[in-house]
């Protein structure tokens, strides 16, 4: 199993599953999960900044990492910060991103 397959499985099982769960259950999740989302967003932000830097340095494409920095990380931090006071639209965006993650990575896993 190569690196890209591991990344795809990780996104399908862990992140896709987490985003679907939170998107469906909305505020009916334990408080610790909001804390997890908050810190996950921070980790995603800084990790993908590093990835953009390393890709720019060697002249490779980095658009997917920018997507994580601009959309996914701030969304996770916001939902984690607002907790049970999060607006429904942000849970729906998480749900959409969960389906997108599963679909995108599933497609490339089985291609």
Please identify what each model-predicted range represents.
Residues 8, 15, 34, 38-41, ...:
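Residues within membrane-spanning alpha-helices of integral membrane proteins
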Residues 43-55, 77:
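Canonical alpha-helical transmembrane segments
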Residues 1-22:
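N-terminal signal-anchor transmembrane alpha-helix
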Residues 11, 63-80, 97-100:
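Hydrophobic alpha-helical membrane segments
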Residues 107-111:
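Juxtamembrane boundary at the C-terminal end of a transmembrane helix
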Residues 1-3, 23-32, 50-61:
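Short juxtamembrane and helix-loop transition motifs at transmembrane-helix boundaries
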Residues 4-8, 29-41, 61-65:
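A loop-to-helix transmembrane entry motif
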Residues 24-28, 58-59, 76-93:
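Membrane-helix boundary connector in multi-pass membrane proteins
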